[in-house]
A protein has these predicted regions:
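A short LG(V/I)-centered, amphipathic sequence patch enriched
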Residues: 40-57
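Beta-alpha-beta core module
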Residues: 151-158, 163, 224-273
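Short helix-boundary/capping micro-motifs
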Residues: 10-28
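Flexible hinge/capping segments at coil-to-helix
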Residues: 155-190, 194, 272
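Hydrophobic hinge/microswitch elements
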Residues: 126-139, 145, 195-254
């Protein structure tokens, strides 16, 4: 099996066809076809099939695709590691959840002092988006909540700081003077997580208080959309208390200080267990860890 075969296979899958893959790689279509057929012959399996919408991987092809992406990512990291020796170049890609994004400015500033020429890519999203990108090595690491991720031997988790949930609403909300969850149970709510997600705030807040989870809950997997709904409607939601206090959100959102204790959660760093970070990615990870200590003291 040659690296060029893996490259060609990935190009076909990502482009959706032989012609598009050939154009992307700057080679002829027959060359791509021979390469993929040779790979299939070596693996004794058909990896690709034509459909009305384009070329897609077969079941064996999907299994090989996951490994091929990891192999390509490992090769790219190996090349970067060699380039980085004795130089201050290279690249790092990492993900942050909205809560953990608070420490990015401090972390990047520290990192730039050591690697001013390195390429940095930052992805923001919820854990269900970021964690798969760590698994397939699209991201070097991700900073997000622990509880929403099922145990996985491929991932390592390093706790960084604890955060607290708060009930939030828009300023001037008719329920802003409520002081118990019971007084909010009939309101409309928005959730960034599925209600049955491990460690989610709804069950952990309402059940200990002897209350049922609110019936009117909209699940919204977009952080910006959720913030817009909270700011422009009478919906309620659970957000990080520290995020509300340290960001511009406090200009148009406020906390409802209910009497019941609300759950907290751990934010930490997810990395792959079988792949060491490159020199540059490791330096960024260390900068994030240092920046997180400020949040840990403020929590």
């Amino acid at each position: 099996m040659r690296l060029s075969q893996i490259r060609d296979f990935l190009a076909v899958v990502e482009s959706g066809g032989i012609r598009a893959a050939a154009r992307k790689l700057g080679v002829s279509q027959p060359a791509i076809t021979r390469s993929v057929r040779g790979l299939e012959a070596e693996l004794h399996a058909r990896l690709l099939q034509r459909t009305p919408t384009g070329v897609v991987p077969t079941l064996p092809g999907r299994a090989f695709l996951a490994r091929a992406r990891v192999a390509q990512a490992e090769l790219r990291k190996a090349e970067e590691e060699v380039d980085q020796l004795g130089q201050r170049v290279g690249s790092v890609a990492f993900g942050v959840s909205p809560t953990s994004a608070m420490m990015v400015p401090e972390a990047v500033s520290r990192f730039r002092q050591q690697f001013p020429q390195a390429r940095v890519r930052i992805a923001e999203g919820l854990p269900n988006l970021l964690i798969p990108l760590v698994r397939d090595e699209t991201l070097d690491f991700a900073i997000c909540r622990q509880a929403v991720v099922k145990p996985d031997s491929a991932l390592a988790f390093r706790p960084l700081f604890r955060n607290d949930f708060a009930v939030v609403c828009r300023r001037g909300h008719p329920l802003e003077k409520a002081r118990s969850l019971a007084g909010l149970a009939e309101a409309s709510w928005i959730s960034l997580l599925p209600l049955d997600a491990p460690g989610g705030p709804f069950d952990r807040a309402f059940s200990p208080a002897g209350l049922s989870v609110p019936k009117q809950v909209i699940q919204c997997e977009s952080y910006n959309t959720a913030i817009g709904l909270l700011a422009k409607t009478d919906m309620l939601g659970f957000l990080s208390r520290q995020l509300l206090a340290e960001s511009i959100l406090r200009d148009f959102l406020q906390q409802i200080p209910v009497a019941e204790p609300l759950p907290s959660f751990i934010v930490g760093m997810f990395t792959r267990t079988d792949t060491p970070l490159t020199q540059v990615a490791g330096a960024m990870a260390k900068s994030v860890i240092v920046a997180s200590r400020v949040l840990a003291r403020a929590a």
